[in-house]
Design a protein with these regions (language model features):
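Hydrophobic, well-ordered beta-alpha structural blocks that scaffold small-molecule cofactor pockets
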Residues: 84, 245-380
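A short glycine-rich, Lys/Arg-flanked "PGG" loop and its adjoining helix->strand segment in the class I
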Residues: 173-188
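Short, glycine-/aromatic-enriched active-site segment of Class I SAM-dependent methyltransferases
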Residues: 21, 191-214, 218-222
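N-terminal juxtadomain amphipathic helix
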Residues: 1-72, 236
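Conserved class I S-adenosyl-L-methionine
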Residues: 92-101, 292-295
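Conserved beta-strand signature within the Rossmann-like core of class I S-adenosyl-L-methionine
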Residues: 186-194, 375-376
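Conserved SAM-binding strand-loop segment of SAM-dependent methyltransferases
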Residues: 133-148
Length: 380
């Protein structure tokens, strides 16, 4: 919850987006709705969620994202490791992954690094990690300025991985302060972060949900991490097409040069309303199909159903590969989630995919299971 900016203390803010009151779409089977509104601090220009459920609700026992459930992400992990290896001698490095989830990256990087530590508050995921792997440890907690003292993490790491985590933390400024302290001198931070300026410019409002707590941008991160220099900028060559990938290195240099242009997020409420209308039109145009189901019971799907009554009328089933989601429902609806292996695909003539970046993975999987109908991507 934001009443004043936790960075500069200013109370003046500009409305960026207001989704109204919607369910927690990153969770399943929830009926309660909460306001989802983003405002930009007029002084430091960082955009925050104005009101949000607390982290213990968002990432407690009902949270259901497991990184190992995506074969595409498992394959992508090798690209992360290769990128890190081009910038530092990994086998001599102590590595920290913040937001390690169930250890998909940790398992692969452990054999290539000196030591590996993962930290994540999601206990159901961290408990699945095999801690018998040599030189590897898991901390089940939030990463912040208190945690780095409690677990003795200050100046312990040559490499810190922050992969699509930063826009989900409760206090982004405290997080960045703690982040700057755990890195050794000349150590690096590997970032992948959703660039919400690009998201808004492309009218991809399905990227918003409870749990996206701030819309901090790469150029703002670069300025806030004072003793760090950008040594590699890979643009949007990342797992998600809207995620910016770059590496910052801790340095003692005083003459800091900035890599990223000084840009900021502007109000997009009118575009959001047009997007809502476009979602309704998209599903109205599916009237020629006999049986339409969704694919991917994720936050994107939940947001679409939260803002579109037409989508909820058209789709009653969403398929997913995650067994933990089986037979549950999309929050705020009666839409049921079915495991793809337990559903008769021959009865379907159209599937709507809610996550476009895994299209090839899903298309291949469906064809291998004998699906011959249409696969559409929800992109307006």
């Amino acid at each position: 919850m934001l009443k004043k900016c936790s960075n500069c203390g200013d109370e003046k803010s500009e409305l960026i987006l207001d989704f109204g009151s919607i369910p927690i779409t990153s969770l399943l089977g929830k009926k309660d709705s909460f306001s989802l509104q983003y405002r930009k601090c007029e002084k430091c220009l960082v955009t925050h969620v104005f009101n949000s459920p607390p982290p213990n609700i968002l990432y407690g026992g009902d949270y259901n994202f497991f990184s190992s459930s995506s074969t595409a992400y498992i394959s992508y992990v090798s690209e992360i490791i290769k990128t890190i290896q081009t910038n530092i001698d990994l086998d001599q490095s102590d590595v920290l992954e913040i937001g390690c989830n169930d250890g998909t990256l940790l398992r692969e990087i452990a054999s290539k690094a000196k030591s590996v530590v993962g930290i994540d508050p999601f206990s159901l995921a961290t408990e699945t990690f095999d801690c018998d792997i040599n030189n590897t440890a898991i901390i089940n907690d939030y990463f912040d300025s208190q945690a780095i003292k409690s677990y003795n993490l200050i100046e312990k790491f040559d490499v810190v991985v922050v992969n699509n985590v930063l826009t989900h933390v409760d206090d982004v400024f405290d997080f960045l302060k703690a982040l700057s302290l755990v890195v050794k001198n000349n150590g690096i931070i590997y970032f992948e972060i959703c660039d919400y300026k690009k998201v808004i410019e492309n009218d991809r409002f399905d990227y918003f949900y409870h749990g996206v707590t701030n819309l901090i941008l790469p150029n703002q991160i670069e300025k806030l991490l004072i003793n760090f220099q950008c040594i590699a900028d890979y643009g949007f060559d990342s797992f998600d097409p809207f995620s910016r990938k770059f590496i910052l290195q801790k340095t003692s240099l005083n003459n800091k040069e900035y890599n990223f242009q000084n840009y900021q997020i502007a109000s997009a409420q009118k575009n959001l309303e047009k997007w809502r209308q476009g979602i309704n039109i998209f599903f109205e145009n599916l009237s020629n199909y006999r049986n339409v189901v969704g694919y991917g019971a994720n936050s994107k799907a939940g947001l679409v159903f939260a803002v579109s009554s037409v989508a909820k009328q058209k789709i009653s089933i969403v398929l997913d590969i995650n067994l933990n989601k089986k037979d549950k429902s999309i929050s705020g609806s009666n839409i049921q989630i079915k495991h793809i292996d337990n559903y008769d695909l021959s009865t379907i003539d159209c599937i709507v995919l809610f996550a476009s970046h895994i299209f090839k993975e899903v298309e291949y999987d469906l064809k291998s299971k004998g699906y011959s109908g249409e696969l559409l991507v929800l992109e307006l």
